[in-house]
């Protein structure tokens, strides 16, 4: 089934790097098993500071902020299946769609559920295996894993 971004999601992609926008659109229309939308593209510093203070973000150097090229390099997605879904299997499925689309566009991505893999698109491992590897790595460092399955950021 081919899905299409809503007007609200398209509005949230304004100011996001065109290659990342293309990747999101292709992922949804060509590869996605589940419908998804965009919850965040460009973010201002005031919002970023609030998210960091609440623990929802780990940095003030977010790729959601406008970068030197004038674009945001990050998006957050939300999956739908009879309503909003936050369970990780939905985001693992979306991760496969995003990887396929990014390869088609020629974009390097980092996924928020496997931060240790800087070029997620170059990895051939299953998405859930990459996520498990990230969790194991963080445990071996006596640190907690920051799993942000909805988050995607481009690497330029």
Where are these regions (language model features)?
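Extended, low-complexity, intrinsically disordered C-terminal regulatory tails
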Residues: 25-56
């Amino acid at each position: 089934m081919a899905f299409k971004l809503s007007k609200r999601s398209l509005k949230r992609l304004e100011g996001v790097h065109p290659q990342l926008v293309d990747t999101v659109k292709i992922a949804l229309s060509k590869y996605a098993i589940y419908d998804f939308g965009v919850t965040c593209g460009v973010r201002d510093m005031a919002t970023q500071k609030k998210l960091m203070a609440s623990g929802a973000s780990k940095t003030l150097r977010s790729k959601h902020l406008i970068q030197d090229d004038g674009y945001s390099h990050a998006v957050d997605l939300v999956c739908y299946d009879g309503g909003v879904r936050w369970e990780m299997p939905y985001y693992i499925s979306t991760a496969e769609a995003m990887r396929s689309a990014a390869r088609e566009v020629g974009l390097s991505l980092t996924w928020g559920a496997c931060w240790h893999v800087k070029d997620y698109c170059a990895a051939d491992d299953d998405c859930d295996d990459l996520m498990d590897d990230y969790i194991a790595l963080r445990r071996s460092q006596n640190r907690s894993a920051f799993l942000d399955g909805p988050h995607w950021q481009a690497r330029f």
